[in-house]
Amino acid sequence: MSENRKPLLGFVSKLTSGTALGNSGKTHCPLCLGLFKAPRLLPCLHTVCTTCLEQLEPFSVVDIRGGDSDTSSEGSIFQELKPRSLQSQIGILCPVCDAQVDLPMGGVKALTIDHLAVNDVMLESLRGEGQGLVCDLCNDREVEKRCQTCKANLCHFCCQAHRRQKKTTYHTMVDLKDLKGYSRIGKPILCPVHPAEELRLFCEFCDRPVCQDCVVGEHREHPCDFTSNVIHKHGDSVWELLKGTQPHVEALEEALAQIHIINSALQKRVEAVAADVRTFSEGYIKAIEEHRDKLLKQLEDIRAQKENSLQLQKAQLEQLLADMRTGVEFTEHLLTSGSDLEILITKRVVVERLRKLNKVQYSTRPGVNDKIRFCPQEKAGQCRGYEIYGTINTKEVDPAKCVLQGEDLHRAREKQTASFTLLCKDAAGEIMGRGGDNVQVAVVPKDKKDSPVRTMVQDNKDGTYYISYTPKEPGVYTVWVCIKEQHVQGSPFTVMVRRKHRPHSGVFHCCTFCSSGGQKTARCACGGTMPGGYLGCGHGHKGHPGHPHWSCCGKFNEKSECTWTGGQSAPRSLLRTVAL
């Protein structure tokens, strides 16, 4: 027994000194914060005073748990086993971990007593000169001595009575002050059914401690043995469970340590990123503010320039108007009030002046307009290393000055993508140099106006727009290109869509001899031949066109459309050639 028990006790003592398993080694209630009074052990292995548990708010458990519930079957070892079908529906929450505790039929007092806590409380009281301990027999006076044989704490009166009785005369009595070095001074655990008997045996069938009277009574046919004899088997089973639990504790502690490390790293990373965000934002804000100031200055310069132009034009027109009025008024006065001689005398001067005034060139339109637009989505380059958006544009696109360009402007092939380019200009005919205009394009078959072709408009951001479409059928199509709901120059226009490009069936070669690898039977549509029985063309021989060409139709352009019709005039065998 001693060999098997020492490692078990040693392991437990080691754990209690360094690891908190449940409430072992604790003496104060987590609720009332005082020394434990009748401590009860909950299924979650937390210990609470009986009175404190009774003050908790109970609740009804919705589902009646089965017989395997570990929270309802761990009643006090002093209670009779209850049928598993009679589980309680009343529960409480552990005040430490909030675990649900299903109370047994006997309520809180039917929960297991934490005898380890009782022993710790007693040791704690002994360290305080025994204050708070009352006699185990009379439950009235303070304790002075302890009977080591009965394991009972006795007051002075009960101690004297204990010595006078024959059965207890020779029991060893020890003063409380001499017990301070002890690690265990707990009371004997008595049988709840036979209060005069101590629990010394264990019923294997019922899996619970029993007394001698229980063995000869209710448990007489059950296998029973002394607790000192069965502690090895049951202690070892608990030991195995404990060894299986310890790695989980270590793993969880390691996981929590990793979480702490990651959390610390997370906080540092968040602070670093936040600093980067602040630095970036502050720099970006300064760049935007600087760009804002530049835009406002540019806007002010544009205003000043336009105002100066308008004022200059105004002054010129006012002066011209004054000259015109002077000429008109003087001439009218001369013609209406002057004599014939006076008119003839001043005629030369008046005519010369009026002719000069009539030759003056002037514009009735303002020399500048009020077209100023802010384009927030247009790139404005970089400022302080940041990409900045937003420009001020004074140009306004003029649909009448916009032109269409491209080889596929008036021709296309069925099921092949055709494209052209729209070049936008302002009223002065200058290229806009920017995008962002609302370009509308429509491609409609002339005989199927309700079936428009899908078009794509790509803004090149430089004043040009790439427009593409894919006609599905050959025929005549009408194309509309509008800006600001106005047709551009040349719109609308028609496009002739021809049938799909016919691919070449032969090879594009220099001669038949080279492309066929010297085969005599290979022929070419160019009609050239070679001496020696060769039916195809060869360099420098009769009929060779002198240029690379297609063997199927004889065309010189590699990207051309094949013109071979496959008729009698050009039999298939004539065009055959072999390409290595």
UniProtKB/Swiss-Prot annotation:
Ranges in coiled-coil conformation: 281-335
Tissue occurrence: Expressed in skeletal muscle, brain, heart and pancreas.
Compartments reported by the entry: Cytoplasm; Nucleus
UniProt GO molecular function: ubiquitin protein ligase activity; zinc ion binding
Binding site for Zn(2+) 1: C135, C138, C158, H162
GO biological process: bone development; negative regulation of inflammatory response; proteasome-mediated ubiquitin-dependent protein catabolic process; protein K48-linked ubiquitination
CDD domains: Bbox1_TRIM45_C-X, Bbox2_TRIM45_C-X, RING-HC_TRIM45_C-VII
One cellular-component annotation, GO: intercellular bridge
Any Pfam family: zf-B_box
InterPro entries in alphabetical order: Bbox_C (IPR003649), Filamin/ABP280_repeat-like (IPR017868), Filamin/ABP280_rpt (IPR001298), Ig-like_fold (IPR013783), Ig_E-set (IPR014756), TRIM45/56/19-like (IPR047153), Znf-RING_euk (IPR027370), Znf_B-box (IPR000315)
PANTHER family xrefs: BONUS, ISOFORM C-RELATED, E3 UBIQUITIN-PROTEIN LIGASE TRIM45
Function per UniProt: E3 ubiquitin-protein ligase that plays a role in the regulation of inflammatory response. Mechanistically, mediates the 'Lys-48'-linked polyubiquitination of TAB2, a regulatory protein of the kinase TAK1, leading to its degradation via the proteasomal pathway and inhibition of the TLR-mediated inflammatory immune response. May act as a transcriptional repressor in mitogen-activated protein kinase signaling pathway.
Family in the record: Belongs to the TRIM/RBCC family.
Protein name as annotated: E3 ubiquitin-protein ligase TRIM45
Organism: Homo sapiens (Human)
